[in-house]
């Protein structure tokens, strides 16, 4: 796959959710370095064209600590990001009729892939608040795999988190590279964004999770709101591998 294929922009005025939900999907190529089958695709809806990332269910490798259906967790991550207003996950939808069957379809983030969380944290202080928002998301979602390379800056200057399939486990599994804010008070804006989840989960998210995962998510929100600070990794072991 050429670099040109990775960077072709979407057409002007394309609504991401609309084209992802109803566009025709055509595989462009397989994404390198992915543990599961992950494809760059072209999505066409009338005169509109966009790039997206397609993760079919049939391309998932079995995991001992997660059930099958990681593509649904990719969708759930976007739903959580959207309903809370944290807006750290690119638009992602469930498609039942992709080229390789059912799977998730996520808006492709055009980015400088040489830049990732570690470099961005050092060079882009203006992104630190967005990193805090992503940290809150990862805590609530119980993200087990927030690698540095999963943090990308799009053309709009927004920080996006990709590869969110390993989220929402009932057992505490948080592994992330975002620990620099440990011990800091969490801004009221961020706490207020997730606080409503303590009492009620939107149907669009609850439908993607098991009952014990819903209970655990609400407990994480309650703990976070009660403590009001970013957690500290006292062990130094709660990092994903590889780091990038």
Report each predicted region and the residues it spans:
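Phosphate/dinucleotide-binding and metal-coordinating scaffold of catalytic cores
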Residues: 1-244
């Amino acid at each position: 796959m050429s670099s040109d294929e990775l960077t072709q922009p979407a057409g002007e005025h394309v609504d991401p959710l609309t084209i992802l939900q109803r566009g025709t999907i055509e595989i462009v190529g397989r994404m390198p370095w992915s543990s599961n089958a992950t494809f760059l695709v072209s999505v066409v809806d009338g005169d509109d064209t966009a790039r997206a990332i397609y993760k079919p269910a049939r391309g998932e490798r079995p995991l001992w600590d997660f059930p099958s259906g990681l593509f649904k967790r990719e969708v759930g991550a976007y739903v959580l990001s959207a309903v809370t207003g944290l807006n750290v996950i690119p638009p992602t939808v469930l498609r039942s009729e992709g080229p390789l069957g059912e799977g998730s379809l996520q808006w492709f983030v055009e980015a400088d892939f040489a830049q990732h969380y570690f470099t961005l944290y050092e060079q882009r202080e203006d992104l630190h608040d967005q990193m805090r928002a992503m940290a809150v998301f990862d805590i609530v979602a119980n993200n087990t795999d927030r690698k540095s390379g999963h943090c990308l800056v799009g053309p709009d200057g927004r920080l996006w988190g990709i590869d969110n399939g390993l989220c929402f486990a009932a057992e505490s599994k948080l592994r992330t590279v975002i620990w620099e804010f440990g011990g800091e008070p969490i801004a009221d804006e961020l706490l207020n964004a997730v606080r409503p989840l303590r009492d009620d989960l939107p149907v669009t998210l609850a439908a993607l999770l098991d009952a014990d995962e819903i209970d655990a998510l609400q407990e994480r929100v309650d703990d976070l709101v009660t403590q009001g600070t970013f957690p500290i990794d006292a062990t130094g072991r709660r990092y994903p591998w590889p780091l990038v």
